[in-house]
Amino acid sequence: MLYKFETKASRVKGLSFHPTRPWILASLHSGSIHLYDYRIKTLLEKFDEHEGPVRGINFHMTQPLFVSGGDDYKIKVWNYKQRRCLFTLKGHKDYIRSVEFHREAPWIVSSSDDMVIRIWNWQSRTCIAELNGHNHYVMSALFHPKDDLVVSASLDQTIRIWDISGLKKKMTTVKPYRENDPMRLQDELFGTDISVRLSLEGHDRGVNWASFHPTQPYIVSASDDHQVKLWRMNDPIVDTFRGHYNNVSCALFHPRQDLIISNSEDKTIRVWDIIKKSTVHMIRRDHDRFWTLASHPNQNLFAAGHDSGMIVFKLERERPLFVQNGDSGVFFLKKKNFNSFDFQAGRTVSLFHISKLPSNNGTQTMSYNQTERAILVSSDAEGGSYHLYKIPPKDSNTVNTKKGTGVAAIFVGRDRFAVLDKGNNVVIRDLENEEIKRCQIPFTIDWIYPSGSPGTILIQSEDKIHMFDIQQKKMLCEIQVHGVRYVIWSKDRNYVAFLTRDFIVLANKKLEQICMIHETVLPKSGVWDDNGVFIYSTSNHLKYLLQNGDNGTIRTLESTIYITGVKNNKVFAIDREFKNRIIEIDTTEYVLKLSLLQQNYNQVMTILRENRLVGKAIIAYLQKKGYPDVVHFVKDDRTRFNLALDAGNIDIALSSAKILDDKDCWNRLGVEALKQGNYQVVEMAYSRTSEFDRLSFLYLLVGNLSTLKKMISYESSDIMSRFHFSLYLGDVEERIKILQEAGLHQLAYITASIHGLTEKAESIGNLITSDGKSQLPQLPKQSYLLVPPSPINCNPNELNWPLLTTTKSVSDVMGENRFGVEQSTSTPTGDWESDEDIFSEGKSQQQSSQQQQQQQQKGDWEEDILIGDGNNGGGDDGGWERDDLKGLEKIGTDGFNNKQNDHVALFVPPQPGPSFSMIWARNSQFAVDHIAAGSFESAMNILNSQIGAVNFDPIKSMFMNIFMATRSSLGCNASTPSLLMPIQRKSAAPYITYGLGHLIERLKTNAYKSTTEGKFNDALSHFTYILHTIIFCSVDNKQEVNELKDLINICREYILGIKIELQRKELSIGAQKDSTLGRQAELAAYFTHCNLDPSHLILSLRSAMNCAYKVKHFNLAASFARRLISLNPNPDLATQAKKVFNFAQQTPTPSDIQQLNYDERNPFVICAHSYVPIYKGSPLIKCPYCSSCYLPTHKGKVCSVCQISEIGKDVQGLQVITIQK
């Protein structure tokens, strides 16, 4: 059996798989409903509305609904998309045991302890039928998958089959009765809608579960008489399966095989063979009773709920056993037949038959020797074995078979194969199965794989893959990859892909890592295509991976497949039903990316011109890679506008903005045009958005005063804008006029007076004093003439800023040669311009340059060629003449100015490669390497997935130390900045300063010393520092990894114990110290159960003995004294302990003494948050990093010991860097 997912929660009473998505619902005894994604192992949602245990749960087959029933007598229908309960069905009068949706009708069937089965219409939200007949609790009621039947199981020791065809007919047929017709009432009271077809009796005690077979007329039942029974609806024969030794909780049929699965309160799951009536598999748990089972409606997945959560599992591996037959096809084993599938013919041929299948429970491998046409099959199940088959010729059915024992076997040469035996040796054998050579490897071998070089194999050991030379018996190279599951070589054997559970690593044949990507879904299979692209599959997608790390999705898969080959745009695969499939794929996306990587711009332009862009993702990719000219190939105007702005192409952005005519587009276009100094476009953008203030200022800057004057009359309603315009123009009379229109006559008078407009000032003054009350304002003593500055450049043809010349883009270079002369393969010399020559972007400059070049060419032609001369072809071949001109021998060339030579090509610097920080982050799966690279966010994500880290404040300083310690500053000249040089270890990874030796030294010299001296706060800081530093450590071998794990346990025990002791001391000096003596004694007692060094355990026992003595718990004091004496303390302390022990033996503990929450005879662990004991068998959760124990109520909080991780979070586990010295 294979575990796929496991949860830790309260007791699970009900389970249901979603029919299409990788989800499972679990109803808990605590009253909560949990929705999990078992593929990514994550809790998605919680639903908490029931009061009391929830025993029934079921997904709807097509709608986004599920139904639940609990001990609160309520049936609730939920919508998981809306994340809420839609409605509640009430009618049962006791606990509800099971609920289920009908596959077609809008019905729900429910069973209850009120001895009634009810059928509900969830659309009308009413009960449409009651099934009465059982005289005890009805434990389950289920619909038949196809027929109109219901099966129920009850504690009255019977199983009933109910016929509901009458109910279905009644609910789907319109009755010809009126609402108050007496015949209608008679039909409802005495109609035979539901009848009992069968009542099955045979169990000696109550029946807990009964369910139908998906296709056969069978029923399976589980009972408290420890038996599982198989009933036949058309046959009185009953089969009984015995083996459980406690109540059987649930039983169901395997949907595709002749198997029955049952679970029981005896803490086992058993798989029964219907034919042989015997147990074929069994899962046993030590402390958890099983309560429920569920099977996936479409996949070979099962789930079981137990006391502390649930498990999702498979009975056996579903991966078909296959091996590639070069490029032409694939060999695969189906049942007991070896078959061959030809890619070109698309036909399957049976090769030969074998007598026994290899076990499918372990890891199976198949290797093919194309020269000798031999197939090697190995399995590590049942101790490991291998079989060697030689494919017989067409005219023979005899198969030459050799077999032997070994964990794994692969071909390593034309007539040699390697076997990994149980003794950790690699044995080389010939095709006659005779041993040729035996290689002893100095370290533990986990598995062996084929290698790309002849005479070598790949050896997997711990977190590394080694290449081993069989002849020389030595390691050639290695690569660090954790948990490799599959190794796939390219066709030319130059590249290899390593598939792990979470990563895909590409390397060359020297095992030098090329790239590594993280994959959230388990990679299933993969092959290399002819272009060097790795095509791989997950359970839901077909994907690709380039050697630079770029990856993407090719298409979605309806079911899981295993890729066997790739040719052009066809992917060949085999599914779990052993069917060979040919899948057409669109290779445009990865061919485009590959062409860019190989700088094959012809192919890139072909794809772009044919409009084969997949979507916005490709456009964003090209833009990210530095190809902004992709804007020429985009048709969507908004996307085209955005790309043009990013590329700084104002002309294309302007044309798109005119089509879109959106205010936001014009605003953005105006900002970009202003940056480039494009006056015309800025003017148009401001006009379209009616930003007249900005437009007027623009006119002032460029000196366009005539248009600015027109704006004054245009903005006649806005006095303030007109006044600003008059200030820009320096028009005093217009200013006075505007002030008068605004009623500001005094300001108008002052303006006219100081500008010397005497007549205008007098008329305004008379207007002011005409009422006889107002006086003329006092004129300023000093005044300045407000004249706007004159623009520097008033030439309307030169308002736009000149732009720098740029290099020609890929599309320009390819486009120039589209209809012209074909490019020469030789290097251009002399005055011929190459593709890297710069060109002018200004339209006027480009036209003048072309005219000048045409005029120059025209003049040269007129001087050298006589049009109409019949000999202008020259030579016999019709080539150009090369006649020597006489009389020019003594003439020099000084003074001739070749302007073309002055046109120096702009140097185009090469694109910078990836920095060392990028390489560190890209090539590593360790958080410490990402920290050294400065990629703190990805490091936090890795730590969250590995140890559940959520609080990074305590380790912030370590992040900065690691980041700074991997860089050295190299001083240069005074005028140049310093150079940062990386400090690296092997394989282009940063050097990590934290090591095991440093931590052990600090443990001994600081942490233990402070604890002995009673400086608990100092000791706490030392142990916490060590616990935090372990996350970032690098070690040399697996032994040191184990030492790190021991160090984590030591730090956890000391931190917990010190915190308990500090709280006890805090209570002992508080205002209520006398009232907390009992709690102080409890804390002192808990401290003695921390796994401390004997010298420190002596001190904790002394403290606990004194506390117990003070609160008169003499029996506990005697117990602590006994433990203290057994540790051989110093004589004084031993004498004191003996006195306490003798006194406690003579003096009984008072009966009215306060009882302590402490039982030394019952094993327990201490809750690190509440400091109370968690006795053996009680539910608990742990910190995913330091493994501190907590009560379940503290789930989701930050661990009190390590102060980093989230309590109870499911994680992958800490990965530590191992450096082979």
From Swiss-Prot:
GO molecular function term, any single one: structural molecule activity
Gene3D superfamilies hit by this protein: 1.25.40.470, YVTN repeat-like/Quinoprotein amine dehydrogenase
Cellular component terms per the entry's GO annotation: COPI vesicle coat; Golgi membrane
Keyword match Signal: no
UniProt WD repeat ranges: 7-46, 49-88, 91-130, 133-172, 202-241, 243-282, 285-323, 358-399, 528-567, 910-953
Protein topology in the membrane: Peripheral membrane protein
Alphabetical GO biological process terms: endoplasmic reticulum to Golgi vesicle-mediated transport; intra-Golgi vesicle-mediated transport; intracellular protein transport; retrograde vesicle-mediated transport, Golgi to endoplasmic reticulum
Xref: Pfam families: B-prop_COPA_B_2nd, COPI_C, TPR_COPA_B, WD40
Listed Low complexity bias regions: 844-857
Region annotation (Disordered) ranges: 820-885
Highest taxon, organism lineage: Eukaryota
Keywords, comma-separated and alphabetical: Cytoplasm, ER-Golgi transport, Golgi apparatus, Membrane, Protein transport, Repeat, Transport, WD repeat
Keyword flag Plastid: no
Localization (cell): Cytoplasm; Golgi apparatus membrane
Self-association state and partner proteins as the record states: Oligomeric complex that consists of at least the alpha, beta, beta', gamma, delta, epsilon and zeta subunits.
Summary of the function given for this chain in its UniProt record: The coatomer is a cytosolic protein complex that binds to dilysine motifs and reversibly associates with Golgi non-clathrin-coated vesicles, which further mediate biosynthetic protein transport from the ER, via the Golgi up to the trans Golgi network. Coatomer complex is required for budding from Golgi membranes, and is essential for the retrograde Golgi-to-ER transport of dilysine-tagged proteins.
Protein name per UniProt: Coatomer subunit alpha
Lineage of the organism: Eukaryota, Amoebozoa, Evosea, Eumycetozoa, Dictyostelia
